[in-house]
Structures are given as structure tokens and as C-alpha cells.
Amino acid sequence: MVEAKIKALRDELERHNYNYYVLSAPTISDFEFDKMMKELQELEAAHPEFADPDSPTRRVGSDLSKEFEQVVHKYPMLSLGNTYSEDEIRDFYDRTVRSLNEPFEIVAELKYDGTSISLTYEKGRLTRAVTRGDGTRGDDVTANIKTIRSVPLRLRGSDFPEEFEIRGEVLLPWAEFDRLNKEREEQEEPLFANPRNAASGTLKQQNPAIVASRKLDAYFYYLLGENLPAEGHYENLQAARAWGFKIPDVIRKCQSLQDIFDYIAYWDVERKNLPVATDGIVLKVNSLRQQRNLGFTSKSPRWAIAYKFQAERAETRLNSVSFQVGRTGTVTPVANLEPVLLAGTVVKRASLHNADIIEGLDLHIGDQVYVEKGGEIIPKIVGVNVEARSMLMGDKVRFIRVCPECGTPLVRPEGEAAHYCPNESGCPPQIKGRIEHFVTRKAMNINIGPETVEDLYNAGYVKDSADLYTLTVADLLRLERWAEKSAQNLMSSLEESKQVPFERVLFGLGIRFVGETVAKRLVSAFHSIEALEQASLEDLVAVDEIGERIAQSVLSYFSDEKNRTLVNRLKEQGLRMAVSEEQLANRSEKLKGLTIVISGTFSKHSRDEYKAMIEQHGGKNSGSVSGKTDYILAGENMGPAKLEKAAKLGVKIINEDAFLNMLE
């Protein structure tokens, strides 16, 4: 009875996974899905004799991998020959005509810009996932791949081969890339340069739980093995779609060279509207027999070629390199350029990321450099026009050894790309940066900006965030541009900030890796600053979404006596360092598992108040309507786009009264 129930839950959850992640057509809410998942987890925990490595519960990525085993590819993962030239596409087509001397079809596909993967299935079950590596051998990343919801652990139907491989691309969607970089920016971690690097780095994470949290996707494009269902590559992909694989629906058969050029021209424009990064078109001879006849060179197949889209690039002069220090001490090199037009905007600066990038480019001041804007959020230098160098070559660019602001020797933690200034208490940009972070709207919401922080710091009035609360009107009036009214306004703003809830105070402290969401998780678990200070590593990592890196950062922060003193001074000034009795009493799980979008203007409460209520009762706020949305809380003047999307997806729209009734 129990075994049958477990099997039924597994089958149903896999069906819903397929509907959501492959078909993009969910049939149940996240709440219902999570409820089923929890039931299955509890049954599996109570009955380990029915364990199954392919269970949907394994997708959450709970196992910690110590290392990746090297695996030899059964079929080498060769690179494709590539070109940026339509003339070379024409040459490829003409060579194929001459070599085959019979009719043939070309299959045109988008070239996805991620990290390549090869999956092995035996009797319909995923048994191994291996990265490209050097083409001959790669890393076994099966545990990480199993966390990707669009990868089938068991195949649908029964007409698949006994054993086969399928090749594909692991991708980080643009929306997830933006979310991840925003989170890293808030925590002053180095940003991912593009979704490809982010996907590759994620897949190599030692902890599958981190992989699961980043919402990777996977598209598949080639099958290998004995007894494939068809003699055509295109037809095999359609069969794989029926087995549960995510096969792009933009694949086309081309009967002529003009068909190919039309496909390239269309997607060179339209690819910008896709949810994932692409960097070209792949062309393959459709017939597997003809592929075998054409064969391979030592490096690539003769029956396929990749056409690469031109990246948006410009050439300009490198005038200088400056180094910026962030609030957590991260030192970032920035190239200062002769202004140049690129992708419709004038570019004056470009990212150099870290010391390894600088060394790899072998930059010299005065070099003519190539600046590119592809999938990146800011322009980057991708190369140097060495031929343009004169005999009077400028100084070689080297990463600095000491902090440009305070002169402290920089450190580079083992395994990290970034350099840091360790002088947290004496480095001006770090001090001012922490204060600027503390006063932001999402933290303490104190009505001053960077210029005022700069003035207060230079005048000697403020050396840390606690000093803000000892300011007087007389202090402010001694500064330029300050009058009685503006000084009183700041005093009022400081007083009002003492009512800011604990999670925002914790976020405002600027602990490395503790963003808004992490701060809320910690406050929900520990309720007071004292409890958080006394928490052990084991206590911290037991909190949902808190990994060892965040836990170590929290422990490091509170082990520093200066930080504990700062917290005590803020507490003495009246800031909230604990969840109030009222907040604890009002918490519930009435909205647990529900995702709610707020739209429009309201009369009974503000939007921020409604957001707080949703979180207080266990719900989740979202800024956009999707298949995961359970309700839209709608006020006056709700956006027409959200209204249209809600109608299309069948999302229920509720007003203020209906929402408040849900909380009673």
C-alpha cells in the first residue's frame, strides 16, 4: 500500500515537472506541487526500503560531492568547425553537394551559449551526465544534472533504445542570470560576465543544493547510439521530444542554400527576444547515413558547421586603469577608454574583472583594445590590437599590491579570483560604503545620500553607522549647504529609523553575503541579534538556503569585537535587534506556499505593508506574473499587461478585502 502510494506520487510529480519545465504549461499551483513533494519526502524518510535514485525528491540537490570523477566519452565530444562568413557557409554547402552527389537536407538549429553536456540513458533511466572536458574525457556531474528540472530522470513512453547518449547544452536563462548578478552585486561578489560562465561555474559547484537553487535549464540537440528510432537527425530529435526531452521548437529543415541564409537572417535579429543566450546557428546534414559517409576531420565533423553571430565590438585606446574599492573591500579594476560608440551607446569604461584577466590580456597603457558587448551586462575588453603598438609602448598594466585608498597590502583568498583590502575599520571607501549601505531605503531608509555621507565622514562626525545617531543639529549646520529645516528633517529620519524591523537592521549591517532574503531567513530562524551572535556553524547551515559560505561570513562578522561593539551601540540607540512580540504573535502559515503579485494602488494599506503581510503569513512576493503565480492582489489602476497575462494563465485576481479575509 505504502509502496504504491510512493510510486503514484513519484509518477505524478514527474508528470507535473514535465508539464512545467518542458512544456511550460503547468496544470497545478506551486502550493499543490510542494504539498505533494513534502508528502513524498516524508514517506521516503519513513520507508527507506523504497528508496529510488530517480525520485523527484533527489532533484533538490542535498548530497555534497567532494570531487568530480573523470569519465572517458564513449563517443568523443568534438568541436564544430565555425565561421562568421556567409561565403564559408556557401563553401560548406558546395563541398557537401560534391561529396555526396545526391539530394540531402540541412537541419538548421540555434547554437545555444551555455556549457555542453552528454547524458547516458539505460533502459529509460538517466545513469550518467558528463561535461565536454577536453572532448575525450569529462567530469561526471550526474548529481548536479539531476537537479535541473527540464532533464528527465526517467523517459516517457517505451519506444526508446535500450541505451543511448543525448547531447545538449546547460543554460542559465537571462532572467535567472540577472537575478543572480543582482544578488552578487548586493553582496559585493564578482559578477558573472555572461550566462555561459554562470552556467559552467554552477555546474562545477561541489554542492548540488547550490546548483538546484540557480534554476538551470537544458536544451538537447543530438542523439548517439545503436538502434535509434530514425535515420534522420531531425526525426530522432522529434522522437526525443516525445520521450520528455526539451527539444527547441525552432529547428528547421532547409532544402536550399537560400533557406539557410533566410534562417540565419531571421534569428540574427529575433534571438534577442529569447529567454536564453545564443551565439550562432548550427547546420547539420540530416541523414545519419550521409553523416557517416562524410565522416570527420581530426577535430570536427565534415557534416556540420557553426555560423557564429558577430558580437558587437569596437576598437579604442586604453588611457588608464583605475582600481575601485567596494564596501566589503573587493578591489575591482576598471579600464578607462577613449570614448567610442558601441551598440548605440558611448562607452568610456570597461570591466577588467580581476588580476587573471589583466595578465591574460597582456595590456599596456596606450594599447588599441577591442571592446565587446555581447551577453555581458557591461562592456569588456576582449583583446589587444598588437599590430597597432608602436616602439614607444606604454607601461604594462599590473594588478596593484596595496589598497589604492589606505595602502594596506591586498589579500586574495585561496580559490577566489578577487583581491580584497582587509582593513575594514580604516579604509575610507569601505567605511563610507558601509554607511551608505546602512542608510539605503531597503535597509534603514535614512534620508541622506553618498554626498552627505562623504561630508559627514570628512568632517569627522561619522566613522561608522552608529555615529549617525549621535549627530546634532549644530553638527549639521556647520556643514556647507545645510539649513535648520534640512537638519531637523535628518533628525526626524534618524528617529523614524528606530522603528525599522529587525531583518532590515540586520541587512543594513552589511555582513558579506547577507542580502535582503538571507537576512529574512536568519531573522525568521533566530528572532534576536543575541541568538544570532551565539549561533554555531551547525545552527546556521540548518537554516533554509543558508550554506557554509554564508554561515562562515556570519560567524566571522560576530567574532570581531569591533562589530559586536557596533551592534551594541546601535542597540543602545534604540534600534530593533529582535523580532517584536507583536510580530511573533501575528506570524502564521496561512499563505504558506502561495506566490502573490501586487499591482495597482490601494486604500487600506500601502503596497509595502501588503508585501510585509504576505511574508509575515508565509507567502512569497513576486514582481511579475508567471505560471507560478497563485494570486494577483489588485488595486486601482492595475497594469493592463499584468491583467492580460493573468487572464491568459488563469491566475486568480483578488481585491484588498478578499486578501484580508484570507488572513482572518
Swiss-Prot record:
Its cofactor is Mg(2+); Mn(2+). It catalyses: NAD(+) + (deoxyribonucleotide)n-3'-hydroxyl + 5'-phospho-(deoxyribonucleotide)m = (deoxyribonucleotide)n+m + AMP + beta-nicotinamide D-nucleotide. One of its GO terms (biological process) is DNA repair. InterPro entries: BRCT_dom (IPR001357), BRCT_dom_sf (IPR036420), DisA/LigA_HHH (IPR041663), DNA_ligase (IPR001679), DNA_ligase_CS (IPR033136), DNAligase_adenylation (IPR013839), DNAligase_N (IPR013840), NA-bd_OB-fold (IPR012340). Its EC number is 6.5.1.2. Gene3D superfamilies: 5' to 3' exonuclease, C-terminal subdomain (1.10.150.20), 6.20.10.30, BRCT domain (3.40.50.10190), DNA ligase/mRNA capping enzyme (3.30.470.30), Helix hairpin bin (1.10.287.610), Nucleic acid-binding proteins (2.40.50.140). PROSITE patterns: BRCT, DNA_LIGASE_N2. One of its GO terms (molecular function) is metal ion binding. It holds the Pfam family HHH_5. The active site is at residue 111. Zn(2+) binds at residues 403, 406, 421, 427. Keywords: DNA damage, DNA repair, DNA replication, Ligase, Magnesium, Manganese, Metal-binding, NAD, Zinc. NAD(+) binds at residues 30-34, 79-80, 109, 132, 169, 284, 308. It is an enzyme of class 6 (ligase). Residues 586-664 form the BRCT domain. One of its GO terms (cellular component) is cytosol. DNA ligase that catalyzes the formation of phosphodiester linkages between 5'-phosphoryl and 3'-hydroxyl groups in double-stranded DNA using NAD as a coenzyme and as the energy source for the reaction. It is essential for DNA replication and repair of damaged DNA. Belongs to the NAD-dependent DNA ligase family. LigA subfamily. PANTHER family: CHROMOSOME TRANSMISSION FIDELITY FACTOR 18, DNA LIGASE. This is DNA ligase. It comes from Parabacteroides distasonis (strain ATCC 8503 / DSM 20701 / CIP 104284 / JCM 5825 / NCTC 11152). The lineage of its organism: Bacteria, Pseudomonadati, Bacteroidota, Bacteroidia, Bacteroidales. The gene is ligA.
